[in-house]
Amino acid sequence: MAKGNKIPLTFHTYQDAATGTEVVRLTPPDVICHRNYFYQKCFFNDGSKLLFGAAFDGPWNYYLLDLKEQNATQLTEGKGDNTFGGFLSPNDDALYYVKNTRNLMRVDLTTLEEKTIYQVPDDWVGYGTWVANSDCTKMVGIEIKKEDWKPLTDWKKFQEFYFTNPCCRLIRVDLVTGEAETILQENQWLGHPIYRPGDDNTVAFCHEGPHDLVDARMWFINEDGTNMRKVKEHAEGESCTHEFWVPDGSAMIYVSYLKDDTNRYIRSIDPVTLEDRQLRVMPPCSHLMSNYDGTLLVGDGSDAPVDVQDDGGYKIENDPFLYVFNLKTGKEHRIAQHNTSWEVLEGDRQVTHPHPSFTPDNKQVLFTSDVDGKPALYLAKVPDSVWN
């Protein structure tokens, strides 16, 4: 198979056994299919098409699912696609993704013509998820010195990599000219670079590694490399994770948890004043994502975290549910079970993670699960009770 190939899909609809919520499985359970990273754009603006990664052709490539026609068009081919970091352009005309840890690619969604926007220098490796600004004219990413890089194919290697203090740099790439500039370079594992929506001068990034060992995870820096500031000082025994910008740029939301405390806390940072406040207590969700203005949040219940060193202080019962939190009403809703295994699969630590997010109309939640076999894509309906 090759780019442009169309794959017919048969959707499977069922009622969740615990909540009665309508859930639709979009992809077959005998082929690895997964969504992109939860804060990267995956839906067309009108919700009609969905970007995802899949192994229909052997390698993991990008596909575009037409939800009305129930078919998927292959967008990329060959080995080496980072099928988590890719995203759709604001006007739905292109896919951007990184191939072979080196080439930043743009795929025209009409012609499927592909071109290289930027190439990582030979002595560096492109790492993680790269994120564009709101206008999609530039992108921030992380590069790691090639001599320091090791593939992080399981959580043990993830933890070990932290202690190597790899040489990392936060870069900015002009998506028109392909020119790159270094914003920050440190002998410290850096990750999660994200432009603040609507504010190109504010770039967030993190100190990566086991959450209980990282001194301060979240940082802001100006786009020109000035005014680097610590977003918050961790409390004693506190871990912070899975930070994201509310899509309207009003706040950065993150998950906080404490040693010997089974609760999780949804917290919010003001991007200007750095005021840190607790929004609510929640069940043990791993990832969170919001709707456009941050009034609704969705999270995936999880087991004890694997990305800590001292796991003895973080034991919890596995929670298999998806939760929606209405911050206006203060109510919490269990909408459906994801029942995923969270297992590492084919050397990938993320492919079985639900990574839930809302559809553009906020009426459904997209997530990944391997409950029926291999990882597949699902849509769970947001019940009317969430709005009341």
UniProtKB/Swiss-Prot annotation:
UniProt cross-references to InterPro entries, sorted A to Z: Ogl_dom, WD40/YVTN_repeat-like_dom_sf
Reaction it catalyzes: 4-(4-deoxy-alpha-D-galact-4-enuronosyl)-D-galacturonate = 2 5-dehydro-4-deoxy-D-glucuronate
Listed GO MF terms: oligogalacturonide lyase activity
EC supergroup of this enzyme: lyase
A Pfam short name: Pectate_lyase22
GO terms (BP aspect): pectin catabolic process
Annotated Gene Ontology cellular component terms: periplasmic space
Pathway in which the depicted protein is active: Glycan metabolism; pectin degradation; 2-dehydro-3-deoxy-D-gluconate from pectin: step 3/5
Cited function: Involved in degradation of pectin, which causes soft-rod disease in plants.
Protein name: Oligogalacturonide lyase
Originating organism: Pectobacterium atrosepticum (strain SCRI 1043 / ATCC BAA-672) (Erwinia carotovora subsp. atroseptica)
Gene, per the UniProt record: ogl
